[in-house]
Amino acid sequence: YTPLAAHASMEPPVAVAEYREGTVTIWAPTQNPQAVQDTVSAALGIDKKNVECHVTLLGGGFGRKSKPDYVAEAALLSRELGKPVKVTWTREDDIRYDYYHAVAAMYMKAAVDEKGRPTAWLQRSAFPSIGSTFAGPSAPSAQYGAGFELGMGWTNVPFDIPNHRAENGPAKAHVRIGWLRSVANI
């Protein structure tokens, strides 16, 4: 069993936005400036060519800073207040509204030969897919996981395992699911 895990980045989500006459300029530590343009333009009802994003240094994002919800908040506030706005989330809000690494339940079974080399590996798992965030909750990949998710961890195993099988069952996401970038396969 793997529990939900929050990113808890060194710095909480923060953004500065300045809205002027149908355009907005953003300064934010983001891992995905294109998503900033898409999300902010949709939130403000403007063309994404009118969203300028300056990427600042970020104190560890681990995948969390690829989701621009905090940036859209700053842009909306700037438009409503008619002046530049800086939004800094509290640590409590950062944890509460994170895109969590998915909870997972797994069963694993392996076999080794007389020399201790792995000969077989069976892995059964159930986890909410990242597809629930990107493709929407009704997409098939949101329930069963996408192929790339099932392959993570299999592509760089340091052993030649002649017999391996990975099975995945459905699991619904009850919170926002997101990438949790880290060392190795997490």
Q: Where in this protein do the model-derived segments appear?
A:
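Short glycine-rich loop/turn motifs
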Residues: E11-A15, A105
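Alpha-helical support elements that line or immediately flank enzyme active sites
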Residues: A15-L81, S138-M152, R181-I186
